[in-house]
Amino acid sequence: MSYYLVQSTDEDILKHAECGGAVTAFFKYLLDKKLVDGVLALKKGEDVYDGLPYLVNDSKELVETCGSLHCAPTMFGNMISKHLKDMNLAVSVKPCDAMAIVELEKRHQIDKDKLYTIGLNCGGTVPPQTAKKMIELFYDVDPEDVIKEEIDKGKFIIELKDGSEKSVKIDELEEEGYGRRTNCQRCELKVPRNSDLACGNWGTEKGWTFVEVGSEKGEELLKNAQKEGYINVKAPSEKALEIRGKIEKSMINLGKKFQKEQLDEKYPEPEKWDEYWSRCIKCYGCRDVCPICFCKECALGEDYLDKGTIPPDPIMFQGIRLSHMSFSCINCGQCEDVCPVEIPLAKIYHRAQLKIRETTGFVPGIDDSMPFLYK
């Protein structure tokens, strides 16, 4: 692996970026040189809790995508496979986005040769409504007064309209049931090395982006962007590498701790799951939002049910989904996010996947091989 500190040479990008603007600079280079048809990224909607997927065709609009949006837990994998698969794209990806793209490529739903994946180091995301309640309770401010947020050094930091900042330790927030989504708490993949380039601020100097190269395609992109004057590049110090490694290791260990707590020590008893399944209204939200569930025709779909009959029994519906998808679950948490009756679906899928991993060694989104059931 190769490591670099990267900084955009564009003053407008530097003005809007959080740490060097490398991600936006890579996107600008790709668009300007017509190496891609568009860039898929997030931009802020009405406020910091509203992250909108944005397809950019003009590099002048890229500054609208600068900065982090930790309260917008969206997924790009199924967006690409369902709506943009014929385009040459550059896309910003969290680790779970990158994992979804890997799994979809194996199933011929995405052609990765058409993609440049620019990874973003990720410590987790916060549901927008949870974020608003959390800010009201723990920061004692109106959530509408927040103009910017970031996660840094174990704290959730907000900036207000008057220019002031407030911060609270994430540990304290999560002890009270707030903070990051529970699937993010359990996540072990913090640096998306399964993307072409992995970018972040861990271990970096102020005003620079720490970039780890994940592929030959990524190395070529970085070198060409430097050659064309879009970025400044220098080598990170040994201390920077050490700091980054320590942060990543600490985050991974924390994820394993939450796995033990949520999927073992405090995992719901069978009776509780009976209660959860009885809530299911068969809305198909979990199926439709899952980035790995790609079947064009679903045996459980409404079109395949006799008219006048009730939809599948909840246990049958969820059981078939579990047997079909658990071996490839990437722990993105989307199924749990959209469930209108608050069934903790991500817990059972993630737990099942970890059991499969113990038995087979297969890690979805990381291994190049197909899941064992496909062999």
UniProtKB/Swiss-Prot annotation:
Q: Which residues bind [4Fe-4S] cluster 1?
A: C280, C283, C286, C339
Q: Spell out the Pfam families in the cross-references.
A: Fer4_8 (PF13183), FrhB_FdhB_C (PF04432), FrhB_FdhB_N (PF04422)
Task: Using the UniProt record, name the top-level EC class of this enzyme in a single word.
Answer: oxidoreductase
Additional comment:
The genome of M.maripaludis harbors two sets of genes encoding the F420-dependent formate dehydrogenase (Fdh), fdhA1-fdhB1 (Fdh1 isozyme) and fdhA2-fdhB2 (Fdh2 isozyme). The Fdh1 isozyme is the primary Fdh and the Fdh2 isozyme may not play a major role.
Reactions accelerated catalytically: oxidized coenzyme F420-(gamma-L-Glu)(n) + formate + 2 H(+) = reduced coenzyme F420-(gamma-L-Glu)(n) + CO2
Name the coenzymes or cofactors required. [4Fe-4S] cluster; FAD; Zn(2+)
Query: Where do the 4Fe-4S ferredoxin-type domain residues begin and end?
Result: 268-291, 320-349
Q: Which residues form a coiled coil?
A: none
Q: Copy out the induction comment.
A: Expression is induced by formate limitation.
Name of the featured protein: F420-dependent formate dehydrogenase 2 subunit beta
Gene name of this polypeptide: fdhB2
Q: What is this protein's function per UniProt?
A: Catalyzes the oxidation of formate to carbon dioxide, with coenzyme F420 as the electron acceptor. In vitro can also use methyl viologen as electron acceptor.
Spell out the InterPro entries in the cross-references: 4Fe4S_Fe-S-bd (IPR017896), 4Fe4S_Fe_S_CS (IPR017900), Co_F420_Hydgase/DH_bsu_N (IPR007516), FRHB/FDHB/HCAR-like (IPR045220), FrhB_FdhB_C (IPR007525), Helical_ferredxn (IPR009051)
Subunit structure of this chain's protein: Dimer of an alpha (FdhA2) and a beta (FdhB2) subunit.
Which top-level group of life is the source organism from? Answer: Archaea
Q: What are the protein's UniProt keywords?
A: 4Fe-4S, Electron transport, FAD, Flavoprotein, Iron, Iron-sulfur, Metal-binding, Oxidoreductase, Repeat, Transport, Zinc
Q: How is the cofactor bound?
A: Binds 2 [4Fe-4S] clusters.
> Which Enzyme Commission number(s) are listed?
1.17.98.3
Q: What PANTHER family is this protein classified in?
A: 7-HYDROXYMETHYL CHLOROPHYLL A REDUCTASE, CHLOROPLASTIC (PTHR31332), FORMATE DEHYDROGENASE SUBUNIT BETA (PTHR31332:SF6)
What's this protein's family per the entry? Belongs to the FrhB family.
The residues listed in the UniProt record as binding [4Fe-4S] cluster 2, with positions renumbered to this chain, are C290, C329, C332, C335
Q: Name one GO molecular function term.
A: 4 iron, 4 sulfur cluster binding
